[in-house]
């Protein structure tokens, strides 16, 4: 029996695992997919929100502000990409100025530092490519951008280094109460836990409702995005929002930490928790809305589109608490935007709840830091030459779009919680994330995965499950 079982290895579940590993507890993370960061955490805006948009007094506002504050130190400790680039919220009409000022006042009430209302001239001085329609903007200097994959993986790897066990390809089918805690019934057998942390994203309501009479409901809210080539990078430096509406913050235009431009999301409620397809209408809306903010966006440089589901709870609020009618069952539910920004604070809050329940001793051997995959592009020319002398695989470029080496892919496969699929390698190294979208490097990456894991290429998938790539070999190859 584990002390704590966490359902879900997204950014919230992984942040909880990392925080809980600071205590002497037996912890297991159960994930139905083949890797961490396979749900909402892999398909979002990659934004660290300032906290201006959250309703004052809500848990959502509290978690957003605290998570934002934690990001600088965490990104250094855990070695993931984060940049505090600031954000602008645009107003296109004098008629909307009262709403802009209301949003500004809400941000002040939430404790967001450094907010400033800019007139059109100052906004365009800050971002010259903004639409001429812009009459004013709110500047939020604490807004930032982050690599969501890198952040999620960093939390999980650090948790694993501190003794947390991860069970992948393990789907929870049912949860039963027992005297000592809970039984999680999976396709791989039963898992017993004294305490359960429900961080299951769009499925969090399903697990909550298995153990509680106080039902909740989560609607999948699909958001579609378009990603522009790195050649388009530099058209904006700040994250560009429009005034938020009923369904969220609207379509944004933002740089990514790797130099692309990201546009999106839409906000379409539907009933398929696994429905992450894009639509012609959705992508057309992304283009129309994005070019309203930044008319010169080079939309011919879109290299891919994608969609993700946000876990929209009917009350539009984070639910992070022990259930009154299910002791030792802790919800981490309704985690939609700003969930990525809030994840570090969510981990803190869940750990505080569990600490109150167990009163465990501190883990004296807790490892606070984690080193990510070596990026040769950040080395000096002399340092890179020395690296290649020592490890020649770092001189073999596999992904030409993103200049990713064999050494980086080998590290991604062999490190704790290493990549097993093409998408797993992509999330860790960016191999396959460039202009050709893995058209060139996939076969070579598969050879490396097969070699390093000692498996056949026939067993390698794009993203786990039934996403097989090769069904037979035409030559005597691995």
Which residues does each predicted region cover?
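N-terminal Rossmann-like FAD-binding beta1-loop-alpha1 element of flavoenzymes
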Residues: 2-29
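Flavin-dependent oxidoreductases
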Residues: 15, 175-264, 268-279, 288, ...
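Glycine-rich FAD pyrophosphate-binding loop
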Residues: 22-42
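Dinucleotide-binding Rossmann-like beta1-alpha1 core, especially the glycine-rich loop
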Residues: 46-126, 250-251
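Short beta-strand to alpha-helix junction loop
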Residues: 55, 62-65, 92-99, 138-157, ...
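Helical element adjacent to the flavin cofactor pocket in flavoenzyme catalytic cores
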Residues: 138-195
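C-terminal catalytic lobe of FAD-dependent flavoproteins
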Residues: 248, 257-258, 274-397, 404-417, ...
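Iron-sulfur (Fe-S) cluster-binding segments and ferredoxin-like electron-carrier domains
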Residues: 405-416, 439-457
